[in-house]
Amino acid sequence: MSNPAFTFDHIHIISQTPHESANWYVEMFGAEIVADKIAYGAPQIFLELGGKTLIIRGHREGETPMPARPIQPFARFSSHNAWGTDHFGFLYHGDLRAFHDELRAKGVQFPVELKQGNGGHLLCYVSAPDGVSI
């Protein structure tokens, strides 16, 4: 049984261009910017998306962030082929094929084309800014 003392709070992304990245989530997924602050010398932008918080922040003095590895297709699956977070997922309540086409028309890149998942549901991988896979 899950521990009721814990709930999922946020995803935190480090970005080379935090305002551009935040605006991408607004334009592509309808996120809402709810705060834009400076934290420890770097922009820190809070977005609400699907009832959850996405935080995008800029480079802080002393950091040397490494670029994320791109997602790769393998025989029966796709992966960043690296330890750590592979992707985060949204559940889309609507016609995913139509939404996929809408995103493609806006210039979104898809490292893996639409495909059926193990449970029979449709999967759509999106390349987001900063090497993030959704």
Regions found by a protein language model. Give the residues of each.
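Short amphipathic alpha-helices within nucleic acid-binding modules
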Residues: 24, 95-102
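N-terminal beta-strand motif that seeds the catalytic metal site of vicinal oxygen chelate
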Residues: 1-22, 85-88
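Core segments of cupin and vicinal oxygen chelate
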Residues: 13-63
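Acidic/polar helix N-cap motif
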Residues: 17, 94-95
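Vicinal oxygen chelate
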Residues: 1-4, 100-134
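Short, flexible, mixed-charge acidic loops at enzyme active sites
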Residues: 60-77
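Residue-level marker for the onset of beta-strands and adjacent loop->beta junctions
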Residues: 9, 42-43, 86, 99, ...
